[in-house]
Amino acid sequence: MSVSELYFIKILFLSIVQGVSEFIPVSSSGLLVIFENILQLKNNNLLINVTMHGGSLAAVVLFFFKDLINLWNNHKLLSNLIVATLPVVLVGGLLQYLGIIDQIMNIAVIGYATIFFGLLLFFSDKNKEEKFFTKSISHKDSFIIGLYQVLALIPGTSRSGITLTGARFLKFNRVDAAKFSFLLSIPTLSAAFVLGTYEIYKLEETSFNTLSLFAFLFSFLFSLATIKYFLIFLKKFSLNVFVIFRIFLGIILLTFYYTTH
């Protein structure tokens, strides 16, 4: 197998990891750190990163296409999504401008955050009372979930995980909480895709190629499958399996960090 073929396989594997981990309550950044080291691949390819996120964005838009079309008639859901999105836009924009996010992007932070927010997910999922978004959600609830989403700016938190945590603490049922979390991912994924595309445009010499097309396709397919089957999973099971996974993942990351520093 040639070097280029091996690189192709590695990128496709990372695309699968991106597609799956984007929509379940695990640390996608933690998983990528592990697999990038196992595969001896530091994925600093901006084009690949953008197309992978583009694949996840296309998947969630397709899955919730009817809901998105009906947003103009469902003013309550639209306004709640806007309210929940504003905190992360404002805080994230400020932190990005100050360069703080890049400063805290390291394996130790990812490891500790993976464990801590995994435990927080565990306690939030203990709520027995379950409310439904369509009947009970208020702008106050949406704003609180939006504040939880701000914590996703900490590497290792998991955006889907922390919004699920916030919704479960507010006693919303798992499936509705997940759907709201997925809809909330659209603005953040869109922002990442647009900003990334702009950076690619500024580079000028970067052009889309076969590898980026496959990265998009694999991320899209696995994102779509993950959304569908995760919602089915939540109808029958608790989030404990993801809590356990996060704790083990965090331990692996911290062990790797402290044995190499």
Across the structure, where does each feature detected by a protein language model lie?
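Multi-pass membrane proteins that catalyze or facilitate reactions on polyprenyl-/lipid-phosphate substrates
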Residues: 1-261
